Amino acid sequence: MKRTACIMDLKNIARRRVPKMFFDYVDGAAWTESTKILNVQALNDIKFKQRVAIDISNRSAKTNLIGSSFRIPLAMAPIGLTGVIWPNGEIITMKACEEFGIPYCLSTVSITSLESLAKAASEPFWFQLYVIRDRDFVKRLTQRAEAVGVETLVLTLDLPLSGQRNRDIYNGLSSPPKPTIFNLIDILRRPAWSYEMLHFRNFNFGNLKGHVTNLERGKSLAEWTNDQYDPSLNWQDVKWIRDLWKGKLILKGILSPEDAETAIEVGADAIVVSNHGGRQLDGAPATIQVLPDISNAIAGRCEIFVDGGFTSGQDVFRALALGAKGVLMGRALIYGLGAGGQAGVQKALGFIAHELETTMGLCGVNSVSEIGPHNLHAN
């Protein structure tokens, strides 16, 4: 990783190192992947307004998110199956985030369980929750999160059923992975990954193991998710979670001002403007396109995060200028993990921070609180 300069360099290394079915799980999106592509294109279309002859010698990207101070306005987005990208992937990604100074969010469908991650943590981490059919299990999962010291719950709302991700179907992705000829050949072509994973051999969802019996029998991921996610999920369920959870509550998956208003009504401390990275509804707008309208509707009544297509510190600047308090990044940091483990995640975070701080300087900005629409050229 010595001769790397940006997230795309780490992505290319990860693509070569990680078996295709696992890389595609992270990198892929729903159907034609048009929304994933649009997320990136829409960000690139936003141009900065450069300013000169302004003292920028004391600039800082430090910020407060959900009542805590962090080095930059960034959080690790929840990503499932991180532990198959690198052994103990969730743990070492969390450690990289802790050392750098940003919050880490554990996914419900992680390889590492809440309890195992908590044993390795030195700072409180966030936990992302899916509402599945078994409400008693959902309740117990929130109680487990509280018991290990989680202070911020991220409730995902845009997955009442699973979007079709064609790459996962083509690759036959399952948990644990099925030993098909294609997959075995692909794994043999990745000796570095195979060597690292040889003694790990954990490919099940740590938070769900023992709860879903088909999980251990290698049921396909698409079949499993369609069986477990609950299409009856509604705002009364969200209110139920709000009543259960005494800590901070972030609602993820908001794409309209109307849903943002309802999120505030049920007691959300923050929302995430998100299209699930294009992994759910292909054809949905880019998150950066809908962010301004949602920000105007919220008018400061809760914090706004955004995700979807963000791969650089410049993208973070764009989001802040259009009304976000912070950005969640998933794929970008997992590319770092796949390229070089904990050191790769740290490298990715370093790229993002440097890009953000440099862009701030060239736009004449000394603190993230100064960033606004005036720093962008009107389209």
Region roles according to the model:
Residues 1-68, 176-233, 369-371, 377:
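An N-cap/entry alpha-helix motif that binds or orients negatively charged groups
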Residues 47, 62-64, 73-77, 103-107, ...:
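Short, conserved beta-strand segments within well-ordered enzyme catalytic domains
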